[in-house]
Curated annotation (Swiss-Prot):
A GO CC term attached to the entry: cytoplasm
UniProt xrefs under PROSITE patterns: ZINC_FINGER_C2H2_1, ZINC_FINGER_C2H2_2
Self-association state and partner proteins as the record states: Associates with pre-60S ribosomal particles.
Keywords: Cytoplasm, Metal-binding, Nucleus, Ribosome biogenesis, Zinc, Zinc-finger
Database matches in InterPro entries: C2H2-ZF_Maturation_Protein, Matrin/U1-like-C_Znf_C2H2, Znf_C2H2_jaz, Znf_C2H2_sf, Znf_C2H2_type
Similarity-based family: Belongs to the ZNF593/BUD20 C2H2-type zinc-finger protein family.
Zinc finger region(s), C2H2-type: 56-80
Name of the protein described by the UniProt record: Zinc finger protein bud20
Superkingdom of the source species: Eukaryota
GO molecular function: nucleic acid binding; zinc ion binding
Function noted in UniProt: Involved in pre-60S ribosomal particles maturation by promoting the nuclear export of the 60S ribosome.
Name of the gene: bud20
Organism: Schizosaccharomyces pombe (strain 972 / ATCC 24843)
Cellular localisation: Nucleus, Nucleolus; Cytoplasm
Length: 124
């Protein structure tokens, strides 16, 4: 008997994208909005489908935990501290995107304001 022939088809055509988006978390700009509206996370409704009945939630990481002890251990960990570091940066806005392609009105910088106000006449 001869050897088994190799497959001549695409092995996993796009499956990695399906697996990646199936359990996709929240983006940083969504978490920024959650941090500004943190009052709605003070009293969470009881949900039997979530870990810890949905009562122990880390807003910065958008994760539920089984107990308050698990939440405290998480907040001391590297993953949580790395997320806090990423959240210090302001999210990219639509105005910045439009200014990058010269569609919208960019914010006027200090240098351009000074250039507009300086009407200096040079003596000959």
């Amino acid at each position: 008997m001869g050897r088994v022939a190799r497959k001549r088809k695409h092995h996993s055509n796009g499956n990695h994208a399906l697996f990646r988006t199936r359990v996709y978390g929240r983006d940083l700009d969504q978490i920024h909005n959650d941090l500004t509206e943190s009052e709605k996370f003070d009293k969470l409704p009881i949900d039997p489908d979530l870990p810890g009945l949905g009562q122990h939630y880390c807003i910065e990481c958008a994760r539920y935990f089984d107990s308050s002890q698990a939440l405290l251990v998480h907040k001391k960990g590297k993953v949580h501290k790395r997320r806090l570091k990423n959240l210090r940066e302001e999210p990219y806005t639509q105005e910045e995107a439009e200014a990058a392609v010269n569609i919208g009105q960019p914010k006027q910088s200090v240098a351009s304001k000074l250039a507009d106000n300086s009407n200096v006449v040079m003596a000959d």
